[in-house]
């Protein structure tokens, strides 16, 4: 069986090296190793829903602690919406597990025990470095800096998490790193001609990333989730102005999640500007041809985290009417996903 072999030729595309394909130590790949294709696909599809929903709820429970029971319903609803998103099947589990990574890192930050480092090390079993790992590590380094400044002391716990997570990716995707670092094989992306857009073209790409699904990240947010989040954010701003408490608005979690979405969209747009892309490749030569605009792959999770925060704001009014509106909004958000004819939306097409 060439699946576990090294230096073997795989009978596809006229014959390519097995080492050029993804690692065998990945949950989604393992499904196809031991199951018929149809059942492996279905199992992976439903695992994506289970992992996406479960990890989202775990994160919400960890963040809100004793207050979590108050938001349990909308946490499950928003998590289910995230799990149902018709994301690229081969990496659907990697998309779905993003909240799990955040959950583990929060436990590490709070000194919950050394075994959380072990869980972080094996996390790449669910993930994929080229789509998510590189950016998780970059975000984690930023978190170390920000938390250290905020706490006025170096955050060693999260700093240690950086090499632990990196080592996990190297071990679980050893073929990828072997090809990248110890092989003279050139990737097709090194020779691909990328767009070099002007200012208006870059703005168009940023707008597209903010409003529509990009690549394999079909978040289905523009129809309903985006308007709900913007309306609630404006409502929070108006309330803060009326109470002369803009400081509270500036600390709004919803605001910062939406700003992170905008940042990811900015990076996506700037990728299509030749000088900016050239600067990135000059600073990091081994990553020449790497699509660093994949920051947008984190936006599906961020959009439904923003939805949860918007619904939570309605719950926090303490009024039954707004709670019912929040519950209705959660149902509509799920219906939009199920009824959208997206490429990988098996619930719609079947």
Name these PLM-found stretches.
Residues 1, 7, 19-24, 129-141, ...:
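Transmembrane catalytic cores of multi-pass membrane glycosyltransferases
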Residues 30, 55-63, 104, 108, ...:
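Hydrophobic membrane-targeting alpha-helices
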Residues 40-51, 88-92, 128, 173, ...:
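Hydrophobic alpha-helical transmembrane segments of multi-pass membrane proteins
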Residues 50-62, 70-150, 158-177, 337-338:
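Membrane-embedded helix bundles of polyisoprenyl
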Residues 73, 313-346:
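Signature aromatic-anchored transmembrane alpha helix within multi-pass, membrane-resident enzymes
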Residues 1-56, 80, 91-92, 195-199:
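Membrane-interface coil-to-helix junctions
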Residues 85-93, 248-317, 346-350:
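Membrane-helix boundary/interfacial segments in multi-pass membrane proteins
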Residues 62-67, 107-118, 146-157, 240-246, ...:
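Membrane-interface junctions at the ends of membrane-embedded or membrane-associated helices
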């Amino acid at each position: 069986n060439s699946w576990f072999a090294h230096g073997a030729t795989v009978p596809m595309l006229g014959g390519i090296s097995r080492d050029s394909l993804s690692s065998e130590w990945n949950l989604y790949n393992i499904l196809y190793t031991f199951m018929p294709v149809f059942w492996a696909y279905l199992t992976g599809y439903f695992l994506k829903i289970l992992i996406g929903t479960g990890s989202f709820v775990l994160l919400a429970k960890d963040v809100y602690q004793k207050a979590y029971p108050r938001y349990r319903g909308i946490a499950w609803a928003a998590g289910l919406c995230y799990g149902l998103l018709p994301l690229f099947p081969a990496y659907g589990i990697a998309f779905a597990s993003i909240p799990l990574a955040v959950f583990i890192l929060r436990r590490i930050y709070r000194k919950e025990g050394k075994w959380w480092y072990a869980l972080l090390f094996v996390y790449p079993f669910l993930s994929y470095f080229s789509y998510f790992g590189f950016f998780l590590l970059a975000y984690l380094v930023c978190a170390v800096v920000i938390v250290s400044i905020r706490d006025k002391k170096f955050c060693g716990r999260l700093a240690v998490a950086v090499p632990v997570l990196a080592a996990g990716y190297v071990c679980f995707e050893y073929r990828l790193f072997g090809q990248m670092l110890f092989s003279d094989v050139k990737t097709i992306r090194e020779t691909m001609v990328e767009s070099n857009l002007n200012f208006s073209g870059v703005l168009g790409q940023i707008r597209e990333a903010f409003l529509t699904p990009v690549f394999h990240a079909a978040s289905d947010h523009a129809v309903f989730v985006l308007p709900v989040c913007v309306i609630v954010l404006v409502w929070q701003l108006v309330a803060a102005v009326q109470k002369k408490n803009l400081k509270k608005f500036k600390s709004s979690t919803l605001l910062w999640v939406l700003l992170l979405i905008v940042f990811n969209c900015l990076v996506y747009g700037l990728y299509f500007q030749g000088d900016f892309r050239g600067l990135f490749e000059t600073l990091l030569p081994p990553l020449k041809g790497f699509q660093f605009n994949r920051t947008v792959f984190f936006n599906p999770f961020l959009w439904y985290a923003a939805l949860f925060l918007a619904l939570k704001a309605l719950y926090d009014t303490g009024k039954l009417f707004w709670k019912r509106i929040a519950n209705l909004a959660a149902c509509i958000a799920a219906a939009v996903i199920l009824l959208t004819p997206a490429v990988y939306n098996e619930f719609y097409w079947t």
